[in-house]
Amino acid sequence: MMVESASETIRSAPSGQNGVGSLSGQADGSSGGATGTTASGTGREVTTGADSNGEMSPAELLHFQQQQALQVARQFLLQQASGLSSPGNNDSKQSASAVQVPVSVAMMSPQMLTPQQMQQILSPPQLQALLQQQQALMLQQLQEYYKKQQEQLHLQLLTQQQAGKPQPKEALGNKQLAFQQQLLQMQQLQQQHLLNLQRQGLVSLQPNQASGPLQTLPQAAVCPTDLPQLWKGEGAPGQPAEDSVKQEGLDLTGTAATATSFAAPPKVSPPLSHHTLPNGQPTVLTSRRDSSSHEETPGSHPLYGHGECKWPGCETLCEDLGQFIKHLNTEHALDDRSTAQCRVQMQVVQQLEIQLAKESERLQAMMAHLHMRPSEPKPFSQPLNPVPGSSSFSKVTVSAADSFPDGLVHPPTSAAAPVTPLRPPGLGSASLHGGGPARRRSSDKFCSPISSELAQNHEFYKNADVRPPFTYASLIRQAILETPDRQLTLNEIYNWFTRMFAYFRRNTATWKNAVRHNLSLHKCFVRVENVKGAVWTVDEREYQKRRPPKMTGSPTLVKNMISGLSYGALNASYQAALAESSFPLLNSPGMLNPGSASSLLPLSHDDVGAPVEPLPSNGSSSPPRLSPPQYSHQVQVKEEPAEAEEDRQPGPPLGAPNPSASGPPEDRDLEEELPGEELS
């Protein structure tokens, strides 16, 4: 039925166009001779037109191609119709012609035959063969046309030289430029035809097929900037311009039998290449853009590192980059889930940028302040209740003038150690990074409730590798309160930590020791035995017993309240930055006497909010002197052992009396954590 309709279409079409006779009666199997005759006839027509006019426009050349395509398409349809209608024909001829397409069919254009008819007539292998033969024949005709034009130019040069009237080189250059522009237009028409075929779904080019015949088109002659070099007499004196063109690699006088045997000139046109986007959508790009994308990422990918996928929440192991690219195209294609993850990552980046802007502004203000003379300080010196009779306890003077650089007026130093986040020469790296939990307690006591914070930034903590600014006790309590029956096993608490926070998923599991430590330490967590085993509940009254801490009560709570009020604005990044940027005056030997240097040794750089008891130094029994009040304001804080020391040693070190040890164990800070638990 399909072949009959095609035959009726061909018979009803006009057959007497431009001297081309009807071929409806030629239904026999002589396709090879007819094809060869047609191709040679078309070549003669092109040659005759070129000889008569001297130049041929792209429209005329396209007109010849359309005529030839119409004629051969009719012949091809009639041959197939006759082959299918006569079952007595041998099947070997049909199998041989299944892939082979007559050469002249390659000149078919979308205006002559619709895509639906091409899909009905030709199989996919025939479409591939059709495209290749079309490119080969187009290239062959272009090269013949180019050869004729060069021969005409050569003859004109010889005749003008013999007549003694040399034509100006500018005129020859303009003529050559016009001819090259015609070639470029033909090449663009061919590329547009290929793209139209691909958009209509008729053909899917492989990269080697797409870049094969197109590379043989002469691109060096298309560039107008190369024309002045061609006409500057680069050849021998008296040599015609045609020979100089040949030296540039543009000699196309030698013809080849097939289009596949053409040698590529030095400069070739950019081939079409298929580049697959990461979400699996193919697109057609030029080789220049494709090569630039490969130069940016020669052997790496931003989402691939250490053998695993860095897509948020994925962590799929991939052996090499090729397997990762395959995983990226299949698992993280353009869908709703990936789009939502991208939106979450955008929010993470925005929050980090806002935080970075705030910290940068704070740093600029600090640097501007440290390079200026201090203004008149407001006196604020109110000593807290020191314990009388304990000679080993020293006063810590917090002075704003302790941070001044060289060249500024500085108050005289005393035997007391100034609480500044500097790094003494004898302080090791272990003590610098050992007080991580302490630097978060002061700010955590006065922040918003953990439930509202987690509700607002749930996606942020779930996907970003950022440690949550909460204590383990508050996190354990929140995990238990979120359950309907208000009880969890230890394994369920671990699962809540890893489910809610990406930090605990991606770091080492030392935090589990801290969870167990806090569960056994605080009286608010009650262990209950039931049918499932041991579960943990929260005694809310016990948890809220000392929150917020009151000024009257344990000296530890008083110390934490004052340190939180004084240094609540100093977060971890601020103190770490100050510790690394050591000023010359603070590191000078004149800043620290032997007593203050020895008392600084057990201090870590981030224990501003929780001072540690210093080691006794020589002559430290006498009370230290205070800094002059006209230069600084002092906050005198009684030093106590750090909470980490309380966890390891209940008694005070070196025989010093510990007031907090005399009280009951529940007077300890509720937010006490495992010592040295800070994760890298």
Swiss-Prot record:
Residues 1-56, 262-306, 407-445, 602-680 are annotated as: Disordered. A zinc finger (C2H2-type) spans 307-332. Pfam families: Forkhead, FOXP-CC. GO terms for cellular component: chromatin; cytosol; nucleoplasm; nucleus. Residues 287-298 have a biased composition (Basic and acidic residues). It comes from the Eukaryota. Disulfide bonds: none annotated. One of its GO terms (biological process) is regulation of transcription by RNA polymerase II. InterPro entries: FH_FOXP4, Fork_head_dom, FOXP, FOXP-CC, TF_fork_head_CS_2, WH-like_DNA-bd_sf, WH_DNA-bd_sf. CDD domains: FH_FOXP4. Residues 349-370 are annotated as: Leucine-zipper. There is a cross-link at residues 175, 246, 378 (Glycyl lysine isopeptide (Lys-Gly) (interchain with G-Cter in SUMO2)). Residues 668-680 have a biased composition (Acidic residues). Residues 467-559 bind DNA. It is found in: Nucleus. One of its GO terms (molecular function) is zinc ion binding. Residues 1-17, 276-286, 617-635 have a biased composition (Polar residues). Forms homodimers and heterodimers with FOXP1 and FOXP2. Dimerization is required for DNA-binding. PANTHER family: FORKHEAD BOX P, ISOFORM C, FORKHEAD BOX PROTEIN P4. Transcriptional repressor that represses lung-specific expression. This is Forkhead box protein P4. The gene is FOXP4.
